[in-house]
Amino acid sequence: MKSLTWILGLWALAACFTPGESQRGPRGPYPPGPLAPPPPPCFPFGTGFVPPPHPPPYGPGRFPPPLSPPYGPGRIPPSPPPPYGPGRIQSHSLPPPYGPGYPQPPSQPRPYPPGPPFFPVNSPTDPALPTPAP
């Protein structure tokens, strides 16, 4: 078994230093001559010039003008509609289901007593039993 392990180890080591399938075949030569330089960037205002700065977005200042009131000058906006208008049902807040301090339902009595199951045993002296015939 050691010889099989030794052979497989040598085989794996040899595979590390031999060309794989992706390296087989002759490599083509590099393209003839040097590569062409990239095209120059396109400047619409001529080479060597910096584009003009963008105009400020809100005029001469840095901040936009204040917004005009949506209801005109001096007008008071209408009050919001009532939350429970006609046709709406007002939701009642329900009290907690088990009162305060109960994170779970209150414990109920056990449906059966603890301990081993109870098997009723009728004693032979029980008057409810029929007497055996002699």
Curated annotation (Swiss-Prot):
Its main location: secreted. One of its GO terms (cellular component) is extracellular region. Residues 28-43, 50-85, 94-119 have a biased composition (Pro residues). Keywords: Repeat, Secreted, Signal. GO terms for biological process: regulation of sensory perception of pain. InterPro entries: SMR-like. May play a role in protection or detoxification. This is Submaxillary gland androgen-regulated protein 3A. It comes from Homo sapiens.
